[in-house]
């Protein structure tokens, strides 16, 4: 299973990030120049129609062109029709933070070839609440598995030699559906030692995935 590791040091790292961000920044020696904005490029929107409800993903083809094109290839080839959300990780007792992972795992659908890794340090896209990112083993092995952040997850942006995970969009609408799935029961005997307690007892089917032109009204 292509997957993201869950480090026990996450909460400590997250709290440290908050502490570092709380300091007063040093004044810049020279004012930054404001670049002249170019023509607006619309986000590529995808409607995921799931057994638990709909969610709309706004993808970023400007900052993450490779990863966005890969995801849209699965959409256009209808390869996500019949995919599923199967892994739900919660952090803390309140269950307000975590991630939801989906893709072709556990189905008979076959993935396309792996893609090049687009690191957050290069794209400028970060693991904020609602971010959509690629699951992978080593960098350059991502194919069909993706995850959605519930809450800010700065650790997954990477640091130093860690290239992080490739963010390529965000949930534009349907975070309530994401949270409903996150709260669903877990399988007691699935996931092995690494993912015990993280696999959904009843994976949620992605019935269809289609491009949409404009934001979908709730």
Residue ranges and their predicted role:
Residues 2-3, 21-218:
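Cyclophilin-like peptidyl-prolyl cis-trans isomerases
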Residues 3-12:
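Twin-arginine (Tat) signal peptide motif
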Residues 11-22:
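Bacterial N-terminal signal peptides
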């Amino acid at each position: 299973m292509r997957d993201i590791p869950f480090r026990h040091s996450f909460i400590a790292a997250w709290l440290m990030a908050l502490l570092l961000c709380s300091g007063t920044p040093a004044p810049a020696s020279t004012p930054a120049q404001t670049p002249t904005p170019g023509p607006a490029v619309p986000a590529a929107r995808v409607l995921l129609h799931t057994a638990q409800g709909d969610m709309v993903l706004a993808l970023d083809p400007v900052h993450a062109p490779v990863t966005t094109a890969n995801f849209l290839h699965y959409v256009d080839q209808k390869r996500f029709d019949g995919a599923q959300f199967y892994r739900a990780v919660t952090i803390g007792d309140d269950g307000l933070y975590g991630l939801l992972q989906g893709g072709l795992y556990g189905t008979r659908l076959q993935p396309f070839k792996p893609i090049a890794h687009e690191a957050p340090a290069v794209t400028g896209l970060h693991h904020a609440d609602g971010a959509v990112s690629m699951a992978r083993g080593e960098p350059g092995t991502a194919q069909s598995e993706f995850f959605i952040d519930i809450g800010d997850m700065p650790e997954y942006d990477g640091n130093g030699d860690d290239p992080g995970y490739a963010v390529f969009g965000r949930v534009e609408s349907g975070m309530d559906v994401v949270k409903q799935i996150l709260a669903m029961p877990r399988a007691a005997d699935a996931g092995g030692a690494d993912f015990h307690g993280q696999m959904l007892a009843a994976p949620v089917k992605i019935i269809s995935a289609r491009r949409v032109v404009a934001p979908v009204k709730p």
